[in-house]
Amino acid sequence: MEKTTKNGIHRIRQEGGKTIAWAEESGVKVLEKDGYYFKDLAKTGELLPYENWRLSDEERAADLAGRLSIEEIAGLMLYSPHQAVPPMPGGPFQGTFDGKTYLESGKEPYAISDQQKEFLEDEHIRHILLTNVESPEISAKWSNELQKRAETLPYGIPINLSSDPRNGAKDSGAEFKSGGSEISKWPEGVGFAACFDPEVAGQFAKDASREYRALGITTALGPQIDLCTEPRWMRFVDTLGEEVEMSKKLTKAYCDGMQTTEGEADGWGKDSVNTMVKHWPGGGTGETGRDAHYAFGQFAVYPTGNFEEHLKPFTEAAFHLDGPTDCASAVMPYYTVSYGVDKKNGKNVGNSYSEYLIKDLLRGKYEFKGIVCTDWGITQDPEKTIEGFGSRCYGVQDMTEAERCLLAITNGVDQFGGNSESGPIVEAYKIGCEKYGEKAMRERMELSAKRLLINIFHCGLFEDPYLDPEESAKIVGCEEFCRHGYEAQQKSIVLLKNSAKRAPEGQKGVLPLKKGLKVYIPERKIGPSKAFFRIDLPAKTEDPLPDGLPSKYGTRVASPEEADVALVFIESPACNPYSTEDLANGGNGYLPITLQYRPYTAKKAREVSIAGGDFRENFTNRSYLGKTNTAYNEADLDNILECRRAMGDKPVIVCATVNNPMVMHEFEAEADAIIAEFGVSRAAVLDVVFGGYNPTGRLPIQMPKDMDAVEEQSEDRALDMETYIDSEGHNYDYGYGMNYEGVLPAWKK
């Protein structure tokens, strides 16, 4: 047995028992029984079952759930809005300290804000979503401050911090992503699919779980396991691809790696992070690629009736893990209305409000016993305009917020993402008592409390929720984890084209480039655009290599005329799928989502949309047949074509950041080499360009022949698109890739 005290935290390490830790200022005492020590979290002077670490997590959670008031249970069922540490004024996630902004307050960056105190003390919230942090050390100190305050409150229930994915190598066109600080950097989700090696995803999960725990995070809001069978969806890059068998393998590797603590019989322990797989029952089938964050994209459709395949990453992987934890801890339903799926009740409502999808399928047929947590912001009253970025209570807008909460709870939902006020849940309980009886409602609320508490017990937080900030700083972004992440970035890069036309003597293709060349890299120009929150963004110019070209590769020059080679960085086309101007001019507001750069007119779109109907619209047909849209970043294509003209017989290399499949015929023939990457660092790309890494990645997607092929594929069907064949006869289909020697061997399942 070893007793230590550091930074006001007492810790007892017990041979044959659990390590316990408590804060001096919390007032918690220690109980001794049978030669072991236990925390007296309830401050009763006796060892209660939930305080006894010798009992199972299930027994402890059931005991504590039975002791909580309805108000306390309601607090557990909440999930805070996004929290930044520290919350900077002017940012999207603000906070105050004694009524002052952080900069005015003079507080330490790890201080608890007024709003966070209210979450904990008045609303009984114990689940908090962390976004940006100043540093790992600050995150650890902030986590400790939260846990200290929680330990002083009734029952001493610890905080379960969570995070969206935060290890992306760069902000790859995904504004809803959390920002990691000084953390290992990995490819985006579909980049793991491009590795065609589940062990890479498994290594990420193991490393990230260690980093998460060092930051205080015990729940990952991921992985995102939607089968992305619709190529225009804006969240395509975050998924694990569209091929179901690969997605299943990656899902298992990810969840097992995150949740498993080596050496623990049931897998749960100090290195474990709960996974919340999303989005049930699959969010990758939005009609024509529109996204359900917005009411204009609320409908998921299944034109070929392929609904069941989209469940498989959940039902055949996440719910049946190979590791000892057995099953992903939690599931998040998506915002979507899964249109026409509920044949039993005939209701088209948001997934969390669907009795068929949650109660009958998820809880019933597939027997999921973990937490069901809604996506963020679905219970409040809706926005007045269909373009507004507000509540997504699709199909239940005529209910009160409390009635919506009750409907979700009776379906089997345990938690409400982004909700920080317990009042509507308490009111839902009261309505439920009148409808179902007090005994039944109390049992239902306790069931959710038990599920939520089990995940906190799983991670050992009731015994020791405290971090050593100095150790956290050593773990997060350590050399080993950063190396693993960088290797994964390299493995995820796909070489699509490597023409021999301008290849140096002795090489089969133009790549790798010789070092010491003069390199021209044009700036990118992006036109006016819409941000994730539907805010208008002005046109901008950006340098794809703002820190310059490393001298070990060559010299960057100002014009094509001076250069030996042009290196053109582009991103896949992006556009605005909804226009208030079109609506004002008598249209329906809906525009085609284009995957090409030049203006696209939708000549083969559906005449009548599959889904439609919203109380803010006086029509149901969301078709955009005959309408035209243009990518914000059309100038990316101009850069390629202008470089080709100016470079004459000198090579042009294109490096594409691929957030969605792309129409390649606009520029492929003009490029000597094309590299596709899925959210990796520029350094990893330059390794492939200059011979530092012979590429091994394969396309985890299909590249369409043209936009007609995109319109003709089905939103719910994988690998059903006519693919592009390049000027050298290579088919840009799923599994295709090259290395410096030529085309990789054909991929086999």
Go through each PLM region and give its residues.
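Glycoside hydrolase catalytic-domain context in secreted enzymes
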Residues: M1-K749
